[in-house]
């Protein structure tokens, strides 16, 4: 079962990277070797937008240390999302694209 969850999470991660790159962003993998609980990815979008993403297999929840780190990052004013479905990725990208239209006056 654990192997299937890892495969699902990897599939979601690949989709995230593809979609962020499609809109001109960069999706960096954060090594947690010395920083337990850090989100899996930091997404850098054109226009200076930054998003931290915790990737999970469908239905899985973040561990307590991850939730603690999410709170710390949010307290600094950054956005943190927990993603376990492709639909959530679509929603994040759509929100980013809408913000870009609004800020550039293209609406």
Show which residues each predicted segment covers.
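Catalytic phosphate/metal-binding cores of nucleic-acid and nucleotide-processing enzymes, i.e., regions
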Residues: 1-107
């Amino acid at each position: 079962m654990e192997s299937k969850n890892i495969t699902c999470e990897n599939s979601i991660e690949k989709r995230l990277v593809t979609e962020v790159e499609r809109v001109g962003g960069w999706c960096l993998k954060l090594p947690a070797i010395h920083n337990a609980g850090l989100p899996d990815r930091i997404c850098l979008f054109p226009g200076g937008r930054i998003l931290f993403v915790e990737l999970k297999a469908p239905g899985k929840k973040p561990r307590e240390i991850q939730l603690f780190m999410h709170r710390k990052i949010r307290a600094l004013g950054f956005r943190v999302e927990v993603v376990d479905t492709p639909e959530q990725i679509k929603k994040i990208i759509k929100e980013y694209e809408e913000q870009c239209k609004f800020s550039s006056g293209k609406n």
